[in-house]
Amino acid sequence: MSNVNEIVAGYIAAWNEADGGRRRDIIARTWSDDGSYLDSHRDSTGHAAIDAMIAAVQERFPGYRFRLCSGIEAHHNRVRFSWSAGGTDHAPLFFGGTDFVALAADGRMQAVTGFTDAMPSVG
């Protein structure tokens, strides 16, 4: 297993990166080629779909920053952590959740299942 802390840091960084080229580079480093993301609102597989999903979330919640708000728990090839988003002058509402990750053999994320707490209504 690669360094789990680096993988989770990359995951959070991807959600915060507004530049599409840099975000795609982060996704390529942290997600397996056929990696997937699933929560109650989204289902995305592959780097292009994950990038498009993150861009759509950034458009819906402009100015929000994602932060790790728990320790990272890991065993075998599984990882769990909690996060929050919001908190800038233009985005005072917070929401958060917990993500469960299965890592691929190369240590990158294979599958992320997200459980999001109540999200604020925007626009």
Where are these regions (language model features)?
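Short beta-strand segments that buttress and anchor functional surface loops
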Residues: 81-88
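A short, polar/proline- and glycine-enriched secondary-structure boundary/capping micro-motif
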Residues: 48, 91-92, 120-123
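Short beta-strand edge/turn micro-motifs at domain boundaries
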Residues: 96-123
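Basic/polar N-terminal segments that are highly enriched at the extreme N-terminus
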Residues: 1-6, 119-123
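Short solvent-exposed loop/turn micro-motifs enriched in small/polar/acidic residues
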Residues: 63-65, 93-96
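A solvent-exposed, acidic/Ser-Thr-rich amphipathic alpha-helical stretch
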Residues: 4-5, 22-77
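Short, aromatic-enriched amphipathic alpha-helices that serve as compact interaction elements
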Residues: 2-19
